[in-house]
Amino acid sequence: MSDEDKRSLKVKAGVVKRLRKELDMYAAEVATETAKVQQLRDAGADPHDIKYQENILAESSAMLPDTRQRLEEAFRELQGLVEELGDGLAGSEELVQAEEQIAAVQPLFA
């Protein structure tokens, strides 16, 4: 139950939390940009404007798989660390936070 173990657990839980937010942000951005592209098409907008919005949509869409992969790697690392250190850190705030992050992200990879 060293301070280094607690710090490592806290950092990895923070990484998972940040990547989850990032994934949610990109998913919301894709939904927003998809709606914008459709709105431009429905309005008969200039093809250049439509193409520009499609490029923005493509960039956001391209970030989803990468972010999901990084989240899965961080999730697996955090899971392994919790299994390794769980008994020694039982009841600690860091362990509780790590377990909360695992529970929040686990449905994505189940």
State the predicted function of each range:
Residues M1-G14:
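Short, charge-rich amphipathic alpha-helices with coiled-coil/heptad character
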Residues R20-L23, S61-L64, R68, V82, ...:
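A structural signal for well-ordered alpha-helices, especially hydrophobic packing surfaces
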Residues R70-E93:
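Long amphipathic alpha-helical coiled-coil segments
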Residues I56-E77:
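Amphipathic alpha-helical coiled-coil segments
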Residues M1-D3, V96-A110:
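C-terminal helix/juxtamembrane-tail motif
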Residues D49-A58, S92, V96:
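Short, charged, amphipathic alpha-helical segments
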